Amino acid sequence: PTTGDAAIYGTAVQNGIQLAIDEINEAGGINGYQIEFKFEDDQSDSEKSVNAYNTLKDWGMQMLVGTTTSTPCTAVVEETHADNMFQLTPSATAVESIQYDNAFRMCFSDPDQGKASADYISENNLAKKIAVIYNSSDTYSSGVYQKFAEQAKTLGLDIVAAEAFTADSKTDFSVQLQKAK
């Protein structure tokens, strides 16, 4: 997305891809072929992402680099799988976003992040009792929290409070913080 709440991620991806393509094309392309790049803004919305995918497919796209965020990526992977289209996401972390053999990710998954966070806290003796505040309306936040809680239990870390909030209440955390005391 280059607009909406996740625009910072989509803009960074778009700029990074463009820099790489410019460098490759200036060096003669790939086996003499220049790379053509077309970008569509999905606004981090699943329906718009599927529509963007179809627009790019109609344009003649041969591989998809995207989408950037998990929920739209999970919707689009159904389409790329049906079309046998190679898909590479730079940053969709939900497990479901690469559930088929045509889709790959360049970063860690939600469970990997949750596990690594609990491991880090345990290995560095940072805490034995932990309070967690997470966005229950967000796939990313919920996915990280689930694996964190599982790994924390395995490691003997005590989650003394696990307080959720939703996207429409993300400006005041006083209730959650009070419960975490």
Residue ranges and their predicted role:
Residues 18, 22-29, 54-62, 77-85, ...:
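Sec-exported extracytoplasmic/periplasmic mature domains
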Residues 4, 44, 138:
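Short, glycine/acidic-enriched loop or turn micro-motifs at the edges of active sites
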Residues 7, 47, 74, 115, ...:
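Alpha-helical elements of the RecA-like P-loop NTPase motor core of helicases
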Residues 1-14, 67-68, 129-135:
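Short beta-strand segments enriched in small/hydrophobic residues
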Residues 103-168:
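An alpha-beta-alpha
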Residues 100:
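Active-site segment of extracytoplasmic enzymes that catalyze sulfate/phosphate-ester chemistry
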